[in-house]
Amino acid sequence: MVKLDFQPKLFSTLKNYTKTDFTTDLMAGIIVGIVALPLAIAFGIASGVSPEKGIITAIVAGFIISFLGGSKVQIGGPTGAFIVIIYGIIQQYGIEGLMVATMMAGVLLILLGIFKLGTIIKFIPYPIIVGFTSGIAVTIFTTQIADIFGLQFGGEKVPGDFIGKWILYFHHFDAVNWWNVIVSLVSIFIIAITPKFSKKIPGSLVAIILVTVGVYLLKMYGGITCIDTIGDRFSIKAQLPEAAVPALDWEAIKNLFPVAITIAVLGAIESLLSATVADGVIGDRHDSNTELIAQGIANFVSPIFGGIPATGAIARTMTNINNGGKSPVAGIVHAVVLLLILLFLMPLAQYIPMACLAGVLVIVSYNMSGWRVFKGLLKNPKSDVTVLLITFFLTVIFDLTVAIEVGLVIACVLFMKRVMETTQISVITDEIDPNKESDLEVHEEHLIIPSGVEVYEINGPYFFGIATKFEEIMARLGDRPKIRIIRMRKVPFIDSTGIHNLTTLCEMSQKENIHIILSGVNERVHAVLEKSGFYELLGKENICSNINEALEVATKEIAEFNKAKK
């Protein structure tokens, strides 16, 4: 029976909560809400949905993640990492397909948390994370080319794949709108220089306000009407969304399951990475499993109100910390601020230029790319570089689902290869030095291995990757000793293939009248072997606690054999 480990940080934090804490959380929440606004709009539009869906996601998912999450300062909402996935799902399955996939991902995240797999997510190889994060950054940048250059495709559908997009772009680069280019460059410039004047005011917000006002004045008094705004493409609704559950059918669930896994894995990685970074800054420890359950609930509920996939956002979480956020209350305030903006200020969003949002996303993609880290990993071992490059190019050329699946498979194969290389099997046929043995008392004389006895020392996991290696070593020796002592003091675990290998070895040895003795089996391996029935075949009298005892048994066996021979 799995015991539910669900302990939201909000409830433990409120036990010693003060008015001062509330004041700082209130101010931090307001600032984070303002920071989240342009990003939520930009991520929503870039994902292929309306701007208010991005804000709704930040409200609903942001509230749930703060209310039920396992981190004190985590801020949840839509992120750039999901843009590529969402855009692809909508193109192939439509909005309803996105809703189903997101809700399925929510269920998967809840299960990951219930079965306490939060810590395992952290062990996904770093090259895979960097590879697909950098790949996503390139893809996000690619999706913004049309708005940066003001390209018009005359109703022609923009392909979902990387190569298809660039082919379409090149066919229309003869009709660049230079006003769009100027707006994008000015936006990027403002975002880049704002931190030099103020660390607390987000550059993206400053850029959107200044550029929107500038473009509005150009349209009103300069006669410049060729700069597209949000209002030119979307109908802005300043109202609460109605709850709606998508129609579910088995065929859709089967088709969308791989995509749901991708959303869940990516959401888990990004949220736990964000929470871990936050821990390092505030000196706290988040609860990974509680965080995953909260993320799952958020992703299950958000689509019902028209939201898209959400996760913990590192940039907004750091903004929360830097502005004094101390508890999940700040995240709840951030959601309330966005709700008020949605209800009362949303009509103003129609004046925001699309080229300005493209500039915001160019900065997002640059920050996400982590090109310095990527460059540094290229100096690592070839196996890591292989995983990095394959994951990166698969993300860019195909999609994130393929990249994560293939990247994880390659990482697993390389991991097994490394374990096989580190697991050593040595053969001792003469003597053992007690001064170098941790499971023996130190004696003056060396332990002599009797004639007709071979000692095999296994150092590392006894799993399917090493089982054949053991067989090859014995075959290479070619001789047939009277007794084989298999020393397993440094075997941390054994799998079913290892058990099968030992069983086969024991059966073959018995047919050849070769006696098998196990030495130094730890409690974990001992329990597995006993449960498998292997001890019934071998005989418990042939299980020795250390090599000294095993050699004593072997010496007696050899003496009895020689006596019987005479």
PLM regions and their residue ranges:
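Short beta-to-alpha loop/turn elements within the nucleotide-binding domains of ABC transporters
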Residues: 115, 497, 545
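Short, contiguous clusters of charged residues that form electrostatic/catalytic patches at enzyme active sites
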Residues: 28, 188, 192, 468, ...
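Generic hydrophobic alpha-helical segments
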Residues: 86, 166, 470-474, 550, ...
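Transmembrane helical cores of multi-pass ion-transport proteins
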Residues: 1-430, 434
